[in-house]
């Protein structure tokens, strides 16, 4: 294996290439270097005087020195040359032993480095002596002094060293451990072992490297070790721009010479290459330990000026960079962490503590140095290389100085290696993704260093090159734009990994991705915020493309030459601001959704409040209507206790309404939609006086009621508490129009097809003059809404219209007395217009030839009395109505009317005996509604005739209250000469009652033929629920009625 280096010297120095030795023109410094080569590894030690370096570092030599010649010297066998005018030129030469394993050492298109040989004198180590000072035999120092490039003048390194392969091999064999086998390269060290190894380490004052331009030195050898001993107290290392350093395996460490000299031992592992033909390396299995002084390097961006050198043919980005090296005290620590992939294990055994950093100026225009700021977070785009390697590590954060030209801060990655392990710290943004570290084990090849007689302190730089025992990893090296350039770490075998064990993983590494080296991934930290130009170098799958497919235009790292060039950085600060804006925009939809949700909640709350106000006003209106009617109030609510009970009932209903309202409002505020909540309703617990009062109002307004009308009227007034009063009055007004058809018809037996007869009303009353106009009307059970049709009142006699005002109404006592008659299934007959002196015995004497089961007399008012007679047979009732209507009892004629009981489906007979079914009823009603004579006449202010015969159903009332509160009743009052067809809503929607009857008939087939039993059960359920079925579901009504039927059947 051959390793060649091209070295460029100043014009005042000359060197001769003599095979394996390099002879200088000065005879006093002509020395031959020995090379250590364990397993094909070479070690080269380069030394420079501190004094000479100081003289180079403290003055500008951009205009004082010129390049006189470029010597090309082989380190081993025949060498190759690289011309500065070409980007990449390589000449391959082979040696007798390593014929197929030639590695190329390329510098960045601008500079070449020549090594001159010098021989070490102690313990198998090659000590390279500088030609300017003989006192360097005690201590070996290497200073890579890359002079600043101004314009077209370039000053390179001033020393050329040649490394002898044979001597290097002998020295390496002395150090080689014979008991190391092939597997010893894959070695894990525990925390205790590393702690014992590293306890003697300490760190001294940091040295500052002021770098005018971004540079990286690149060496490509299979085995090379460079050791340096120096203590840079007043020295700088000036790196020229656009030069690159890429070492396969580098170990630079400082050895402790005296108490004042600090020892810097960190391990940085760079990429190592191995040819498959290295049989000797496979047998010996030597594992080398690499150490480096590079502890913490921070490159600061300065003014950049781009110039091209026509003679050199390279790109000068001219980025003025400032670098500080801080030495720390290291205590070995051991932690272990694995990512989810499980391919990479990183072991870190170092604690770094920044202590007394030293800062030295290099140039006048670069005298301003960034001072360390402890425990300070900066606002720079870069995270200022703040990485904590363990729980006790402490790093100082330096704020990056943005470049005025590019407005970007450039930070060079830091390499800190400790205890045979490698850690690379990136000085870029967050260390986020794509960190590849391979496990490698290296042996420390430290040797005694001769003491120097000079006053200058020394620093030892050792470069070890490790041989890969498995394969040649010549993979693509891509450089991340986020961190400029950094060295890569390659495992010594395809299956080995470096284990970094941190007691506390740095916060920057928490989101990193680690990939295997075999996947051709670099050790760059892929940032969350990627450069737009860098994104172009990635394929569609997000992986880095091979640099073979990219042109070497200065923006990529070539795979063959390993020549790393500088990148042009975009304004990451602006990019981060744009990312913040994007993040804010992403949060906008959630805020909009929250606002929309809030508005929806407010709208539903407002709607609920409106519903609550309607219900509240409904109850208040009912109470006000009752209290305003003085006559009805005095008659029905005679006692103060009854009035108090009325008020307490109203307050109770309003209190329950408010509680339900607050509960619903709270649920809406919690986000429950209003449509998923039960509706806000009122459960009426009003007194019977409400029903009596509302019934009286409706009867007074209609003037004429049939028996069916009166029955439906009582039902609708009972349901006032659960539906609005206006709605009930409107339905009642519609009922009035249906009461008296023109033709004399009577229903057939079983003619009520749909079961739509009203089964829950108190009584049906037939006027003696209106028996021929009788018609049955139905009610919707579930909604307690009367779907009735209009009727013609043209056949009403004038005397009845005049008498309607004075007819009294049923009282609550009458309704209660009728209940036992229902159970007896008797036929009721209404006798109205009785004089006050008529008694029950008088009525029995008049109706004694008819089988009367019961007689009841009611006093609605002092001027109006009526009686209800119950007959056992229908024929007797019909005969009594026919014969007794209009007779005088004690000097006063009475009106006799037949009333069908609620529990009887048997049709009632009229005078002429004609029959009509319910279906015919609807048809005839529709025909009559279309006729002009179907308009009802409802006089508003017709004066009452005190001495006239009055129908027993009516009594006077306050007309103003009706006009004020019953607008829907007035809407049905039309002019006599204006014919109009009135069609009430839901005329044909009578399904609720039919459903109930049908389901009960299916559940109880034994009583399905006798529907009166089902009706009786429904009435009993209604009575048990205080006379209200409104609000109950059909299923609930069916279940309750079914239970009543079962109990009656069992009894």
UniProtKB/Swiss-Prot annotation:
One of its GO terms (molecular function) is RNA binding. Gene3D superfamilies: 3.30.70.330. Residues 827-901 form the RRM domain. Residues 1-21, 907-923 have a biased composition (Polar residues). Residues 1-37, 533-552, 731-756, 903-957 are annotated as: Disordered. Residues 927-936 have a biased composition (Low complexity). GO terms for biological process: mRNA splicing, via spliceosome. InterPro entries: Nucleotide-bd_a/b_plait_sf, RBD_domain_sf, RRM_dom. Pfam families: RRM_1. One of its GO terms (cellular component) is catalytic step 2 spliceosome. It is found in: Cytoplasm. Keywords: Cytoplasm, Phosphoprotein, RNA-binding. Residues 739-751 have a biased composition (Basic and acidic residues). Component of intercellular bridges during meiosis. Intercellular bridges are evolutionarily conserved structures that connect differentiating germ cells. Not required for fertility. This is RNA-binding protein 44.
